[in-house]
Amino acid sequence: MARYFGELFMLDDDVHACKTLYAEKGESGRVKDKDKITRIILSLHEMASLMDIHLFGFTSRISPVMYNETSFLSLSKMITGCSYGIIYNKNTWWNEELRLKEDFWISCYMKYKERRVLTDLRYNFEQKNTFVNAGGLASIRNQEEERRSILFIKKNFGDSILLKSATNNGKDKTKQLVQYNITCKFKY
């Protein structure tokens, strides 16, 4: 798809809200205007294009307390799979053996190949609980497939992939459904 379109932004069908993480206490933080959401996405695409970055997206952080106003953009953080964009080049490649965690794969692969991924830490695209929903990847998403995908990524990227301890990452039910997760730290 990326090779065919060249430049694209993918937004999962289970995304139900765009939120600002820089909202002040008492402010909603929910972005409801579709035109504003489109401008947010296009603005990040333009920044990525100007910086010659081929993978860009938004944070998976969900709480304003996780927001650092002096570091609202990152070149080293991962993107979240529910909302990211590609500006195609020879390095934008997904391993088709991987059925889950493809966002993690492309983040690691682009960080390895190009040493940077543009992540906007000001906005989060919120998803419904996808681990148990019908449709999409629900038919293959289970603990064993998650484990297989994580071990496959670890096999390919080695010591750069670290297993995270059990956490609920601020989301209900995740702790019970996912036994472990991973993070990435390249030594460069």
What is the predicted role of each segment?
Residues 1-12:
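Active-site nucleotide-sugar/metal-binding loop of Leloir-type enzymes
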Residues 9, 15-105, 186:
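Conserved catalytic core of nucleotide-sugar-dependent glycosyltransferases
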